[in-house]
A protein has these predicted regions:
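Acidic-glycine-rich active-site phosphate/pyrophosphate-binding loop
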Residues: 37, 41-45, 86-88, 131-145, ...
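Active-site flanking loop/helix segments enriched in acidic
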Residues: 50-57, 148-149, 201, 205
Length: 358
């Protein structure tokens, strides 16, 4: 750790961030984000081994683990849990020192960079910054003729995978090239993929609004808007797409506060990872003064109070949809297995808890 660097850097970063509003507590003690967040941190550190993807033509620490560790870092920071920060830094420094591979040629590999950016912010260890900047920069090493990343797939997941990495790079380095990349990319995805009802199909010719797929979009839009300067030429389009999606989510939230495996299908089961992502995305909009109507506050509050009923005493989120490919068959989505403790559910629950406290 480098405490002198940490204190100076923290003051600089805090002073330069967009202003956000504190959330007034609306929860009981057992549902408090402090209690829930610490449970999820404790659970995270029971998992010793790295979860590695070595398929689909690339190799990297699994994006879901990276997103969960990113959530642990933010949560530990807001709780002032220095032991957890050090433990996290020690664990993921091994990715560098032990040369755990990252082929850095796919959005699911490069998004790992959000974690070392956050660890650099918390510790001042430049090895994390070097690793993170490489993953952000190589994403635009050979851009397409339209300026988009050569990793562009127009899969809805990418709104988070690309948007969060480039936004985090801007947040930490303050180099505007990163947020300009994020804005260019995200407006192109919105223009091509957002449906008239504000939601997103899982894929071309797949007319189903899968919960977690839409969750990646919602969280990614919120992340970009939390840093995107209003004078950016793409700000109006991204803001419009975000608000359009948030209004759809208000409409489709179940009476109990959850969202469903298929967002707009009432017979679909209640799914936690999407609920956490949607709640986080809406909360961020309220905190940054984008969503001012009381209905948005009521919606994210209902989501948190419902979501926390799906967390075990040892900090595992239940009813998480397993990884899901694209299928033109509604029963495929309605019958997907549910698991407990998967990083896809742990990660956004940590983000949501952090945002309630930050």
């Amino acid at each position: 750790m480098k405490p002198i660097f940490f204190s100076i850097f923290t003051v600089f970063l805090f002073a330069s961030c967009n202003n956000s509003q504190k959330v007034k507590p609306f929860w009981t003690e057992e549902k408090s984000p402090e209690v829930v967040g610490q449970k999820l941190i404790d659970d995270f550190f029971t998992r010793d081994n790295f979860k590695v993807i070595d398929s689909y033509g690339f190799t990297a620490i699994h994006y879901a683990e990276a997103c969960a560790a990113f959530g642990v870092a933010r949560m530990a920071d807001v709780l002032n849990n220095k032991q957890a920060i050090q433990q996290l830094a020690d664990k993921y420094m091994k990715v560098i020192t032990d040369s755990i591979p990252n082929t850095a040629d796919h959005v699911d590999a490069n998004v790992y960079g959000i974690l070392p950016f956050e660890l650099y912010y918390l510790t001042g260890e430049t090895a994390f910054l070097d690793q993170a900047k490489y993953l952000a920069d190589v994403q635009w090493e050979n851009p397409r003729s339209d300026g988009l990343s050569n990793q562009t797939r127009f899969w809805i997941d990418d709104v988070w995978m690309i948007g969060s990495l480039q936004t985090e790079a801007y947040r930490i380095t303050k180099d505007p090239v990163y947020i300009e990349r994020a804005a260019l990319e995200i407006q192109a995805y919105l223009k091509r993929l957002q449906q008239p009802n504000g939601l997103f199909y899982h894929g071309p010719g797949i007319p189903f609004c899968w919960g977690r797929g839409n969750g990646w979009v919602a969280a990614g839009l919120a992340e970009v808007l939390s840093e995107l300067p209003k004078e950016n030429p793409y700000y109006p389009a991204i803001l419009e797409g975000y608000i359009k999606m948030m209004n759809a989510l208000v409409k489709y939230q179940a009476p109990n506060g959850m969202w469903r495996q298929l967002v707009d299908v009432e017979e679909a089961w209640y799914e936690t990872s999407s609920t956490a992502m949607f709640g986080y995305a809406m909360l961020m909009g309220v905190k940054y003064g984008i969503l001012t109507d009381e209905k948005y506050t009521q919606t994210y509050q209902k989501a948190w109070l419902a979501l926390t009923d799906y967390i075990t005493n040892d900090g595992k989120v239940t009813d998480v949809c397993i990884g899901t490919g694209q299928q033109n068959d509604i029963d495929y989505y309605l019958n997907r297995p549910r698991v407990t403790g998967d990083f896809h559910g742990q990660a956004p629950t940590l983000w949501f808890a952090w945002a309630l406290l930050e």
